[in-house]
């Protein structure tokens, strides 16, 4: 389990334009932080840089567990789960096939997958192909996949957007349990998360 993420002097550019620079952030076990800023400020790009999907113009992201530094590729492959604007679901699978496959692939088990399906009110949808689900149902499936995963660092890009009030409350409870168990959350948001989180301003 990761115990810290250390972002140092990070800068992100798009073409000739610097989105932000000299950003420092340390996130430790049991903490959540929200990235705030205007549209186009670089919040999603920051998440992608932490995930290793985008090369920063400057700076670094380092990871630590209880024994000290963890090689970045290992940390990302074994301890990180990112949920972006797109749900990243395979449309030809049934909801259960997708949830089960992704849960097992990230180190979880069928019991945790079934518990997550129940928590997000997906049981009646599990035999349906993902392509037949509504946008809100697909988001709930993606969140169930996240909840069933034992990975300690969650990177979330507008995770609450398509959810109704009841599902927002359910996901809020899942996030609270994740950080209470020593997990970490870094989220790009327009609206505040329903859990305690410090705010990090992103912008040039």
UniProtKB/Swiss-Prot annotation:
Domain spans labelled ABC transporter: 5-202
Annotated membrane topology: Peripheral membrane protein
Record: residues binding ATP: 37-44
SUPFAM superfamilies: P-loop containing nucleoside triphosphate hydrolases (SSF52540)
Cellular localization per UniProt: Cell inner membrane
InterPro entries assigned to the protein according to its UniProt record, in alphabetical order: AAA+_ATPase, ABC_transporter-like_ATP-bd, ABC_transporter-like_CS, ABC_transptr_haem_export_CcmA, P-loop_NTPase
GO molecular-function terms, A-Z: ABC-type heme transporter activity; ATP binding; ATP hydrolysis activity
Domain of life per record: Bacteria
Top EC category: translocase
Main location: membrane
Catalytic reaction annotation: heme b(in) + ATP + H2O = heme b(out) + ADP + phosphate + H(+)
One record GO biological process: cytochrome complex assembly
Record keywords, A-Z: ATP-binding, Cell inner membrane, Cell membrane, Cytochrome c-type biogenesis, Membrane, Nucleotide-binding, Translocase, Transport
Reported function: Part of the ABC transporter complex CcmAB involved in the biogenesis of c-type cytochromes; once thought to export heme, this seems not to be the case, but its exact role is uncertain. Responsible for energy coupling to the transport system.
Family: Belongs to the ABC transporter superfamily. CcmA exporter (TC 3.A.1.107) family.
PANTHER family: ABC TRANSPORTER I FAMILY MEMBER 1
Name of this protein: Cytochrome c biogenesis ATP-binding export protein CcmA
Organism for this UniProt entry: Caulobacter vibrioides (strain ATCC 19089 / CIP 103742 / CB 15) (Caulobacter crescentus)
């Amino acid at each position: 389990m990761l115990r810290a993420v250390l972002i140092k002097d990070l800068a992100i550019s798009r073409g000739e334009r610097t989105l932000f620079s000299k950003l420092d952030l340390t996130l430790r076990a049991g903490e959540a932080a929200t990235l705030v800023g205007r549209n186009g400020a670089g919040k999603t790009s920051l998440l992608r840089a932490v995930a290793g999907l985008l090369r920063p113009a400057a700076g670094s992201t380092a990871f630590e567990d209880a024994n000290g530094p963890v090689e970045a590729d290992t940390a990302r492959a074994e301890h990180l789960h990112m949920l972006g604007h797109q749900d990243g679901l395979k449309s030809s699978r049934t909801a259960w096939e997708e949830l089960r496959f992704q849960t097992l692939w990230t180190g979880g088990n069928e019991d945790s997958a079934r518990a997550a399906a129940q928590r997000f009110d997906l049981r009646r949808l599990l035999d349906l192909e993902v392509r037949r689900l509504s946008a809100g149902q697909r988001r709930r499936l993606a969140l169930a996949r996240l909840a069933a995963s034992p990975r300690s660092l969650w990177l979330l890009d507008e995770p609450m957007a398509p959810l109704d009030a009841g599902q927002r409350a359910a996901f809020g409870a899942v996030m609270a349990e994740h950080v209470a168990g020593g997990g970490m959350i870094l989220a790009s948001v327009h609206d505040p998360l329903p859990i305690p989180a410090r705010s990090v301003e992103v912008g040039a």
